[in-house]
């Protein structure tokens, strides 16, 4: 007779083998066509790979209202052992999946609700939030999806418990305005660390975000830090700027006209531009059930294709928007990877210009000239391929149909923001934005009502700032004032009623948070805080700063951009 302890050991070994097989099968079924960087043994695996069938079953059981909850849960022991245990128990009578999860995982804690002191002005409220939103994760538990960072950082707030790439730049604008240059330096250091560790800045510091980046604002961050530290900041982060550029341009050397590789595109005339791309083609762990349902709703397309386009939209920061869809009412028609975004290419133009400046600061004039030439080539490609001459605004290019898209979105302001627009075209964009996107509460993201959060009637703080500063770059101060004043009034009215700043706003009126999307409205909120402080400086004179939005609209903006216009604006 076999002793019970040996029998249990044999059974456990069999279960582990089954668990391993199941994990590999799960990986194969979801990732067969993916060029997955997380397959590298040095790269931590996301929870859907670590936990295989268990992850799929928990998410499909909808144990938690937010799918991000289990994606952020920490296994209490080796995931393979947990998975083996699960395979042994799951078919037993009375098995309780929620109890199993509670025993084997540490779930993320709900953040304590911040109650601000009574009677605070808008500025006082924001200044009081910085320590509330600051986190430190120098050390994380084994198997945690959270990735460690060497310095403290400011999170957006709400369900967003980690650092996010493009959010952080607008948060950093506010930190700098508040005099927290130490926090700005810490966050730039964290992003530099991520570039060194992973070859790029992921969407956020989670394992499940490693397969894509976000709008590339690292150059802006370094330029911001250089305002305080001078050219030393440019020289210090030149290697990381170069690595990020290499990530976005990977594969360009071998491309023939009409070909694409990951994030880079070569058009038929040889112009080189970029697109958003995710290295995986699986459901997103933080939105697992939603992505599976989206793919099932369009059986005429391969599910893996839809998954990659959903992930690539997350990389764009605009998740989700009619901008990426053939049918704005049907998310499964999303095709992000066949669209060349105007805002992404404007940001990469800025990266090239910053690389030129940093190379010059480091004494490498030859490299500086090379990067300037690349920036000039991109600027010409933007003017050639991302300008809709019929409509009179900048737009995205459609690779599938080989033509410029007609839709006007707030992304049209990005060439103005980076000083890459021709002067006459900037004036046309200003007129179009005023006529089609400007609403009582700020600038709408698009004019389409799709139910997605990056569409009408929502307006987002970063896009308000891009618009206001871009319009000022070209002397469109009246429209810039309208965007600034209307959005600030919206923020102030919402704060007066609810005592909080939120992630997005309904700009069809004032005093209402935005809706739509995959999750409830979040408060905090990092980038809204930063943009609000900067906009308060725009409408109030330096000698008499304001702590809240004035009741009377100022006659003109008080501050002007400090950027040096590029040759395109001369």
Curated annotation (Swiss-Prot):
Which residues are named in the active-site annotation?
319, 503
Q: What segment(s) does the record annotate as region Disordered?
A: 544-570
Quaternary form?
A: Monomer.
* Keywords attached to this entry: Glycosidase, Hydrolase, Periplasm, Signal
Which named protein is this?
Periplasmic trehalase
Protein family per UniProt: Belongs to the glycosyl hydrolase 37 family.
Family annotation (NCBIfam families): PRK13270.1, PRK13271.1
Q: What is its EC number?
A: 3.2.1.28
Coarse class of the primary localization is periplasm
| Signal peptide residue numbers | 1-34
- Detail which positions bind substrate: 159, 166-167, 203, 212-214, 284-286, 317, 518
Catalysis: reaction(s): alpha,alpha-trehalose + H2O = alpha-D-glucose + beta-D-glucose
Q: Which InterPro entries match?
A: 6-hairpin_glycosidase_sf, 6hp_glycosidase-like_sf, Glyco_hydro_37, Glyco_hydro_37_CS, Trehalase_periplasmic
Q: Which organism is it from?
A: Salmonella paratyphi C (strain RKS4594)
Q: EC class of this enzyme?
A: hydrolase
Q: Please, one GO biological process term?
A: cellular hyperosmotic response
Report the locations given in the UniProt record: Periplasm
> In this record, what's one Pfam family?
Trehalase
A GO molecular-function term, please?
alpha,alpha-trehalase activity
List the biased-composition ranges (Low complexity).
Answer: 554-570
Q: What does this protein do?
A: Provides the cells with the ability to utilize trehalose at high osmolarity by splitting it into glucose molecules that can subsequently be taken up by the phosphotransferase-mediated uptake system.
Which top-level group of life is the source organism from? Bacteria
Give an example GO cellular component term for this record.
Answer: periplasmic space
